[in-house]
Each structure stands twice: as structure tokens, then as C-alpha cells.
Amino acid sequence: MPRRGPVAKRDVLPDPIYNSKLVTRLINKIMIDGKKSKAQKILYTAFDIIRERTGKDPMEVFEQALKNVMPVLEVRARRVGGANYQVPVEVRPDRRVSLGLRWLVQYSRLRGEKTMEERLANEIMDAANNTGAAVKKREDTHKMAEANKAFAHYRW
């Protein structure tokens, strides 16, 4: 924790096409080595694929996917008397969004399709339908929290 008080939270600018801060945050998560224009191209192409395959607005599909991926509970390690306990805690709203975006990109990269655009589009569509690896990650996180419910009184 810094000695000079809390660090100011940086605000991201909405993206030029969809005018959404969420889309900008997703672009930043996709970006590797500062290549933002490449990340934008990947996301916008993925959105075009989603529009083509579903016939729906890609923003609606993306928002539904994010809603299905964001965790409500997670476990955090807490040391009590020489033992480490996995204590279930609620996830802060900003962290929920961050984890959701991170998992969408992370599990898109692990998919088998040829291009990143296809992988991302398919992962977003799967997540919107409550399937896919990112949704499974959320379910696993919730299961861990449920399994460690007995240690909930160690919350801080």
C-alpha cells in the first residue's frame, strides 16, 4: 500500500466504433507488446464474425457473455495459526469485470481454431450460451468457494 494515499484509478476512453469502455478494456486485454491497432482489428473482426453467425448485435452477445463469465465469489488464502485456509470472499464489482475479460481472452488463446479472431468470436458466443472454458472457470471458482464455506468466518 502506498504511503502517499490511494492511487487514482485510471479511466479508459470509450472505443471509437462501439463507444464502450468495456470494449476498450477488452482490447487492452487482447493487446500484446503494445500493439493496440492489431488488438482492435482482432476484436472488431471477431465482432463481425459474431454478427454474421448469430444475426444479433455483437455488443449484446458480448455483454451476455461477460455476465455469464463474471464470478460472484472467489477464494483468497488466509494464514491462521500456521495453517493456510482458502477463505471464500465476494468479488468487488471492478474485479468481477476484470476477471471476466481476462478469462475470456485467456481461454480464447487456448482454443484450437486457426485465427485469434475466430477463437475470440467462438469463446464469446460459447460464453453467451453458458458453455465454453471461461464459463467453466467461473463455475470452478464458485465450486471452490462453496467447498470452503466452512472457513467463511475468517473473512477480513
Swiss-Prot record:
UniProt keyword terms in alphabetical order: Ribonucleoprotein, Ribosomal protein, RNA-binding, rRNA-binding, tRNA-binding
One GO MF term: structural constituent of ribosome
GO BP terms: translation
One GO CC term, this protein: small ribosomal subunit
Functional description taken from the UniProt entry: One of the primary rRNA binding proteins, it binds directly to 16S rRNA where it nucleates assembly of the head domain of the 30S subunit. Is located at the subunit interface close to the decoding center, probably blocks exit of the E-site tRNA.
HAMAP family: Ribosomal_uS7_B
Protein family according to the UniProt entry: Belongs to the universal ribosomal protein uS7 family.
Complex and partners: Part of the 30S ribosomal subunit. Contacts proteins S9 and S11.
NCBIfam families xrefs: rpsG_bact
Name of the protein in its database record: Small ribosomal subunit protein uS7
Organism per entry: Geobacillus thermodenitrificans (strain NG80-2)
